[in-house]
Structures are given as structure tokens and as C-alpha cells.
A protein has these predicted regions:
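Polyanion-engaging groove/track-forming segments
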Residues: 1-205
């Protein structure tokens, strides 16, 4: 069986079907949560500073707005901001226009100030930023039964960030990487992760 199709199949099951027996693993790389975090990382990688303020490139921003996890985490204020950004359809979006709700303020701040620098402090800030996004989004969707599987991926994503942080900065180490290298390393590490469901019902996750 193709594990990459499992998330889509599970998401299509009606809510009135309460117990689903799953006998295969769910790959991180095919999850909505991984997709969302990939867009979040891309937003950081494409931030630019012009005329005294930060801007975000539109494509990863719009991709994030279309992600189901992000949409379910959005409150009314976030939805209003997203609607306004879509109407304006700017190529580069000022950071100030992407603020105004706890979710937006967490996501749309800059942790990668110089993508060409292999600064250890910048990578540490980038990793902590990604962890904060996970910690912010997960509670906002945790009560949604349709997001139960994605919450398992949120836990694994956070674990992966902690692990890579320990490798780079544990025991007093300060290993610098280019942000692009960090993103690739994280993708390689998390892309092979799967959440195992071996003959267990999905209820209660």
C-alpha cells in the first residue's frame, strides 16, 4: 500500500465513523502539518529588508493561507487579515500588514535576517522560531477531531527540532549553518519520520 495516500484517505472519512483501524504508518512528508511548516520556513527564507522595513514574498505566504491546518487555527481576526492580504494581492507584503492576531504575530516575524550567513545564533533563533510556531498552532487545533493525526505530526516535528538543536548547540557547541542547509537537514531528518499505527484504532489520539 502507498503510505502517502493514507492521510488523504483518513481525512475523507466522515466524522460519524468513530473507530478506524489503521495498520500502517503515516509519513511525515505527506502530512498537512509538515506542509504548513515547510511554508513557514520558506517565508523566513524569502524575507527581505527594504526602505527600513521587512517584507515577505507572496508565494509562501499564500501557500500558508491555503493550508488546512493554518486555516483551522485561524480566528476571526486572522481571517480578516488574510482576506485583506488576498484583496491587495501584493508581490511583496509588508510585515506590518501581517500582524494583529496572536497567530499572525507568531508566524510573521523575522528570524532569518541574513540567509547568506552561517551564524550559529541565527540558526538557533530560526529553530526556536519554528518550535514556537508549533507550540502556537497545535493548541488552536487540538480539539478538532479532524486534526488528531496532524497533532501527532506536530509532536514529532517539535521533537525533531529539539534533536537537531541538541546536535548543533548541545554541551556548549555553537555550530553554524546556512539557513538553507538547516532547512534541507531538517527536511531530510523529518521526511523519513512516520507515525506508526499498527492495528490500533485512531480514536483517542
Amino acid at each position: 500500500p502507498d503510505e502517502n495516500l493514507l492521510t488523504a484517505v483518513l481525512n475523507s472519512i466522515p466524522y460519524d465513523i468513530r473507530d478506524v483501524n489503521v495498520t500502517m504508518g503515516l509519513p511525515m512528508s505527506g502530512s498537512l502539518f509538515y506542509d504548513m511548516m515547510s511554508h513557514v520556513a520558506s517565508i523566513q527564507m524569502h524575507a527581505v529588508f527594504r526602505k527600513g522595513q521587512w517584507f515577505f514574498y507572496h508565494k509562501p505566504v499564500w501557500d500558508l493561507f491555503s493550508n488546512d491546518v493554518f486555516r483551522k487555527a485561524s480566528d476571526e481576526k486572522t481571517e480578516d487579515i488574510v482576506s485583506e492580504i488576498r484583496k491587495e494581492a501584493g508581490y511583496y507584503i509588508p510585515m506590518e500588514k501581517l500582524s494583529g492576531s496572536p497567530l499572525m504575530d507568531t508566524v510573521f516575524r523575522v528570524s532569518v535576517t541574513d540567509p547568506k550567513s552561517a551564524s550559529a545564533s541565527q540558526i538557533s533563533a530560526f529553530a526556536e522560531y519554528l518550535k514556537e510556531v508549533v507550540r502556537t498552532v497545535a493548541p488552536l487545533v487540538s480539539d478538532d477531531p479532524g486534526m488528531a493525526v496532524e497533532m501527532e505530526f506536530a509532536k514529532e516535528y517539535h521533537k525533531g527540532l529539539t534533536m537537531i538543536g541538541d546536535c548543533l548547540f548541545g554541551s556548549g557547541k555553537k555550530r553554524g549553518l546556512l539557513p538553507s542547509t538547516f532547512v534541507r537537514l531538517l527536511a531530510q531528518m523529518l521526511g523519513t519520520v512516520s507515525v506508526p499505527f499498527r492495528g490500533e484504532p485512531l480514536k483517542g489520539l
